[in-house]
């Protein structure tokens, strides 16, 4: 397993819409393993493949509490098929937007259909942190960032801050 470098805002790669995974093979399973290692190293609780520059519909999560045994989850081609009308607000952060957090309102409960790392079709009903994290990571697969849910003024300030930091690093900007 390999820790991969993270794509950081304002890199335009983060706005790409990811393509479906066609075949679940050793390469996809290795990618999932690399993503989990990268996520744990960061440390984070979720990571979409696009965040390491791979535009595939693949994400990994682990929302276990610190001190509990790890429960890594792999979602291939995930799709939200049901969302509750009830909403919840969580303070979200993102490994691609380091050290910035904002409250985001999303459906409180969702049902997601996906394919697991063995190629089996699955469905999960999620609420709480798992629902929020799944929605956040699925957004990444669609080129959407959590800052898209905050006011334009705040979003523009965040993008300016990260664009300025990217220029000092010599990185690409949106």
From Swiss-Prot:
PANTHER family from the UniProt entry: PEPTIDE DEFORMYLASE (PTHR10458:SF22)
Its family? Belongs to the polypeptide deformylase family.
> Which reactions appear under catalytic activity for this entry?
N-terminal N-formyl-L-methionyl-[peptide] + H2O = N-terminal L-methionyl-[peptide] + formate
The name of this protein is Peptide deformylase
User: Looking at the Swiss-Prot or TrEMBL record, what is one Pfam family this protein matches?
Assistant: Pep_deformylase
Q: Does the keyword Secreted apply?
A: no
- Species of origin reads Rhizobium meliloti (strain 1021) (Ensifer meliloti)
- Identify the EC number(s): 3.5.1.88
Q: Which InterPro entries match?
A: Peptide_deformylase, Peptide_deformylase_sf
**Co-factor(s):** Fe(2+)
Class in the EC hierarchy, top level: hydrolase
Q: Keywords in UniProt for this one? A: Hydrolase, Iron, Metal-binding, Protein biosynthesis
Active site per the UniProt annotation: 137
* Phylogenetic classification of the source organism: Bacteria, Pseudomonadati, Pseudomonadota, Alphaproteobacteria, Hyphomicrobiales
Which terms does the UniProt entry file under GO BP? Answer: co-translational protein modification; translation
Instruction: Give the record's cofactor note, including how many are bound.
Output: Binds 1 Fe(2+) ion.
